Amino acid sequence: LIAAECYCVTCLAFARDWTDRTSIIKGKHVTGHAREYDYKDGTGFAQMYGYDDQPMNTSANFGPPFYPLEYILRDAVGETGKFHGGVGHTLSTILDYPFLTGRSTQDSTLVGELMIKALEQGLTRFGW
């Protein structure tokens, strides 16, 4: 079982077969950030700390994401797979064994529950 949430789903799109270089999620159903839910600003806010472990008066804001994840995932799954954005729904979690994807961090609890069901009960499909 391979699970990824939020922008980490990108790793699945870029993991490739050595021979034909197709994505390992080709033909699979996945979810991730839809264009409607991409951050417009505020990606990468981080409190920075000095060598004395005290907060510094600075942080990092990279603005919007560096890439539109929806388009990357749509291309990676190909014509026989499907991207499910879950727009308008609080949660968007897809299990297409061996891949379990959650659109964002609010999917974490459900992703964890589905991990248990997949590993202990043999669940192979959920969310579409």
Q: What do the PLM-derived regions correspond to, one by one?
A:
Residues 1-3, 7-128:
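Active-site-adjacent pocket-lining segments in enzyme domains
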